[in-house]
Amino acid sequence: MILTMLGVNGPYPSIKGACSGYLLTSDSGRTRILIDCGSGVLGRLLNECTVRDLSAVVLSHLHFDHMSDMLPMNYLLSAAGVECLKVICPKTPEKVRRILEDGALDLYPTQDMMIGEMKLEFLRVAHPVETYAVRVICDGKTFVYTGDTNECDALTLFAAGADLLLADAGLLRDDWTIKKPHMTSGMCARLARDAGVKMLVLTHINPSYNAEAVLDEAVNDFPEAMVARAGIRISI
């Protein structure tokens, strides 16, 4: 699989950046899944493929920094003559989900399923709204994305042995409390270590943070950690 980072910021984009958006492509190129579609992601997606090339969209949750570009996506689908695009997303918050119900977006509940060559599995995680981590198995490899979450014990088993873990490092240590909705990069590193993953990529980077500071809090527990950057591609 190939993971392309379209946007890596949250809860708002950096200058010339974009919020959460990740394109996962099978080795054959026949299956392409867009995971999250926050502000600024749609234009970057079109550098990689057309909307006709998408097999599905997975929205980890319905906060705007993870789904706001689905609104112009609907306009693009209409212009491209695409009648239906499968979108897997939570049922709540209902008032946000209703925004997605018009047009060509065909909404499916968040549940385990096959999309083309990819097997998708989900885990409810610790965030103020209904939010899911996603595990994707394809081409003999396993990719896990935590979605937005504070510490969640079940993630260790869910991510066990993953070839790549893409984890929410939305906070630095000094900004974290148990009531906050995100992990720190150090927490991500300990999760990766305990789960025995091969590669850790830190994402959902607050634009006010220095990437070096984010990485510094992770490398003691997982020396191979890296900070996500928009535009990079990683072979899994």
Q: Can you name each region flagged by the protein language model?
A:
Residues 1-47, 132-147, 164:
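Conserved beta-strand hairpin/beta-sheet module of binuclear metal-dependent hydrolase folds
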Residues 31, 80-86, 195-199, 223:
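A short helix->loop->beta-strand "cap" motif at the edges of active sites that frequently abuts
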Residues 34-38, 55-65, 89-90, 143-149, ...:
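Active-site neighborhood of phospho(di)ester-bond hydrolases with catalytic His/Asp-centered motifs
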Residues 38-41, 92-94, 125-128, 149-152, ...:
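Short beta->alpha connector loops
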Residues 40-86:
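Active-site metal-binding motif and surrounding structural segment of the metallo-beta-lactamase
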Residues 68-77, 98, 210-218:
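Metal-dependent catalytic neighborhoods of phosphoester/phosphodiester hydrolases
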Residues 83-131, 138-139:
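Metallo-beta-lactamase
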Residues 152-233:
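Cap/insert and terminal regions of metallo-dependent hydrolase folds
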